[in-house]
Amino acid sequence: MISPENVVPMVIESSARGERAFDIYSLLLKERIIFLGSQINDQVANLVIAQLLFLDREDPDKDISLYIHSPGGVISAGLAMYDTMQLIRPKVSTICVGVAASMATVLLCAGAKGKRYALPNATIHMHQAMGGAQGQASDIEIAAREIMRQQDILRNILVKHTGQPMEKIIHDSDRDYYLNAQQAVEYGLIDEILQKPENK
């Protein structure tokens, strides 16, 4: 039996040369839209990075839209995506649909200034870096030092992109910290709430 999460919608596109079937993500990529809709891990990061690099090569002057609906995930994978977003020439607009949590919040706020958005009912969430370790005491100590190093990196990124002082970032991310879209604007995580334009 086919699992619903493994079903990818197909879209038929007609042209003078005939019909062609695209999976929905390929069609979005043609429009310079990337969708991050899962937990962040190495495989997901590799796919997003490949798409960013492809769109950079295709047209370095045209914006890219990164839609985010993610609970976060592996810090190293998220930082690989973050560094690529900062490296490529096109401006990356970020849009939170649903939820951006943890590492996904870092990616959301790292979009191009003035082009970071959330939908009206989106939830943005920050917290401390998390990790686990087992084994000898010295191994656990090494793992703890590494998670603290990564946490410092994430906090510095949040300071850079939100304009908030480090003390506030440390205080607010010490435990689970939830924001609605308006609070995220006030915090500096996003620039604007996307609304449907009113009909005139």
UniProtKB/Swiss-Prot annotation:
CDD domains with a match to the protein in the record: S14_ClpP_2 (cd07017)
Residues annotated as catalytic: S102, H127
GO molecular function: ATP-dependent peptidase activity; ATPase binding; serine-type endopeptidase activity
First-listed, main subcellular location of the protein, grouped into a coarse class: cytoplasm
Record-stated family: Belongs to the peptidase S14 family.
UniProt subunit comment: Fourteen ClpP subunits assemble into 2 heptameric rings which stack back to back to give a disk-like structure with a central cavity, resembling the structure of eukaryotic proteasomes.
Name this polypeptide is given: ATP-dependent Clp protease proteolytic subunit
Organism annotation: Dehalococcoides mccartyi (strain ATCC BAA-2266 / KCTC 15142 / 195)
